Design a protein with these regions (language model features):
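Glycine/proline-rich, positively charged
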Residues: 40, 86-174
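Structural motif corresponding to the early beta-alpha repeats
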Residues: 51, 65-92, 117
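Active-site beta-loop-alpha junctions enriched in small/polar residues
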Residues: 21-23, 49-51, 75-79, 116-119, ...
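N-terminal binding-site loop/beta-alpha segment at the start of enzyme catalytic domains
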Residues: 1-74, 136, 142
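Active-site mouth loops of central-metabolism enzymes
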Residues: 16-30, 79-96, 122-126
């Protein structure tokens, strides 16, 4: 496997990562085998932006014993609950519940890369700030629960706007 070193963090990140949306359809046993095979092939970066909460316990069961070898990317604001369909939220209490649930299901006490999820309009960012979500995430980072905070958007202009609004150019850089 080829790797890139993140110059800001020192993390060695595989050039191939694994997304998770289709994993639960294969079933827990096949899903775990897929993750184990990916790890054996040197893949160490796993993106947990998914429409199905069932992938989280599969990851927890398959990779908890090798947690130090993998990098998890989760998405804050993606709202998961067992057996419920995916939703998106800027509500602080919902984000807190979702983060706690994800940590529990992944059988870990930290998240490597946490993305503020699906920021596509200026109002989305404003709600994150006004609702206290950004402050909560920064508290998690200070506690070591989240190593790095980033932003997920489909709108490049919004990414530039958020970076300008936060007033700290390095705030969201890995």
């Amino acid at each position: 496997m080829e790797y890139r070193v993140n110059r800001r963090t020192g993390d060695r990140i595989s050039v191939l990562g694994v997304g998770t949306s289709g994993l639960p359809a294969a079933g827990a046993k096949e899903g775990a085998a897929t993750l184990e095979m990916a790890l054996e092939q040197g893949i160490n970066y796993f993106d947990l932006a998914t429409a199905d909460s069932a992938c989280f316990p599969i990851f927890g069961a398959a990779l908890a014993g090798v947690r130090k070898q993998v990098l998890y990317q989760v998405h804050f604001g993606a709202n998961y609950a067992a057996g419920k369909p995916y939703s998106w939220t800027t509500d602080l209490e919902a984000v807190k519940r979702s983060v706690a649930w994800q940590l529990e299901q992944l059988r870990t006490d930290y998240i490597d890369y946490g993305f503020i999820h699906c920021m596509d309009e200026s109002g989305d960012w404003r709600r994150y700030v006004d609702n206290g979500v950004l402050q909560y995430l920064e508290t998690l980072k200070a506690q070591g629960v989240v190593r790095h905070i980033g932003l997920s958007t489909h709108t490049p202009a919004l990414a530039r706007e958020v970076l300008a609004l936060c007033g700290q150019p390095n705030r969201f850089r890995f």
